[in-house]
Amino acid sequence: MASKLFVLAFLCLALVVVVQSAPQYARGDVPTYDEEDFDEESLKPHSSSSSDDGEEEFDPSLLEEHADAPTARDPGRNPEFLRNSNTDEQASAPAASSSESDE
């Protein structure tokens, strides 16, 4: 029982230490950052943010390959797939049982 209390006290102490080590800001106080963290030269624009690229470059034929993705059947739930896997298991099961009966 004493060991449980010791562990609980240690966990509470660890929680207090973690909470107190977090930076404390007063209401309305805005945290400041180092200027070198946001170097303008190191920031790169997003590839789609370029206004020079128009929608005329979009090729809808690229989507045709995946057009039936929401309605395509899952091969894992395909009954033919399940029948094939069941017959494979049944075919291997008699072979294993016949080798046991030979002994």
From Swiss-Prot:
Q: Where in the cell is it found?
A: Secreted
Q: Which family does it belong to?
A: Belongs to the anophelin family.
Q: Which UniProt keywords apply?
A: Blood coagulation cascade inhibiting toxin, Hemostasis impairing toxin, Secreted, Signal, Toxin
What's the stated role of this polypeptide?
Answer: Salivary protein with anticoagulant activity that inhibits host thrombin (F2); binds to the proteinase in a reverse orientation (opposite to substrates).
Q: Name one GO molecular function term.
A: molecular function inhibitor activity
Name of this protein: Salivary thrombin inhibitor anophelin
InterPro entries cross-referenced by the UniProt entry: Thrombin_inhibitor_anophelin (IPR018932)
